[in-house]
């Protein structure tokens, strides 16, 4: 239960870091195919038509890029997706703390984790922030070194 609750905030950063590791090893096309596999697995969890549409369109775009475009474009696309994941990961954590500050303790994931573990919710928010910013810093370092 604890891992499931924490996964929503740490998942994008972890996926971005894994993608950065693949790019650091010059595996841009491999990253695109790994994303296709993850999108196919995501179809199991889709609960509505909008989710199905979103996953199928995303998969079609990733497939099209990985199959028909030039290697430079594939690499640029893979880097763009990775930067998006890494740069976007800290924002929900900041929004979580803003919501908690305005409304007080809520039913947020941090508050649920506090109830499950007896660790204060603010500590969980801090952990999420350190983990997502750390993943951003490490992933950025790997990608910048690989691109140089």
Predicted features by range, described:
Residues 1-44:
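Membrane-embedded helix-turn/re-entrant segments that form the catalytic/gating core
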Residues 46-148:
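C-terminal membrane-associated helical module and adjoining short loops/tails
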């Amino acid at each position: 239960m604890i891992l499931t609750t924490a996964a929503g905030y740490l998942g994008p950063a972890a996926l971005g870091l894994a993608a950065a590791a693949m790019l650091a090893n010059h595996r841009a096309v491999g990253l695109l195919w790994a994303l296709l596999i993850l999108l196919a697995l995501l179809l199991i969890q889709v609960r509505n038509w909008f989710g199905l549409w979103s996953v199928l369109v995303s998969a079609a775009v990733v497939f099209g890029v990985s199959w028909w475009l030039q290697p430079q474009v594939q690499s640029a696309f893979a880097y763009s997706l990775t930067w998006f994941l890494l740069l976007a990961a800290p924002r929900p954590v900041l929004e979580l703390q803003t919501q908690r500050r305005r409304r007080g303790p809520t039913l947020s994931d941090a508050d649920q984790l506090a109830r499950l573990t007896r660790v204060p919710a603010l500590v969980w928010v801090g952990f999420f922030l350190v983990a997502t910013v750390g993943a951003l810093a490490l992933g950025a370092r790997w990608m910048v070194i690989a691109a140089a």
